[in-house]
Amino acid sequence: IVCHLIFAFVVPATGSRLIAYITIIVLGVSFALVPAALWPSVPKIIEERVLGSAYSLIFWVQNIGLCLVPLLIGSVLDSSNAANPAVVAAKAEIEQLKAQGVQAPDVFIPYNYTVPLVIFACFGVAALLLALYLKALDKKKHYGLELPNIKK
């Protein structure tokens, strides 16, 4: 959540590459730790007889997200930058070059990514709320989510 908000607000305001590098490293470590914490909890919550179905459902939801979230972000990026003069000018330059029969060079389109990054932060908030719910459920039903899998 914090990383996406830093990318949305702090990095554009400061222009600091150091902050951007540190933020992307923290985000990468976070992405690596989530599966390490998530996958071992599944067999503690789900009955063994339906464990395979549970894993397939998890993969299905992840793949739907991988399919639909880029479409959502692309649509939001286009609509939130429709009135951005720099984006409009860059797109007009590309269209003008195409109309002249010239292959458009790699023209930098200066999109404002604030809204998509806030959406990612909202996904993070939703995940945090689900994690807190799971922790409360663990406390109530004693799944042992924070206990080691290997017992001595």
Tell where the protein language model's regions lie, with residue ranges.
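C-terminal ends and interior cores of transmembrane alpha-helices
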Residues: I1-T14
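A late C-terminal transmembrane helix in Major Facilitator Superfamily
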Residues: R49-A82
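A membrane-interface helix-boundary motif in multi-pass transporters
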Residues: S75-G124
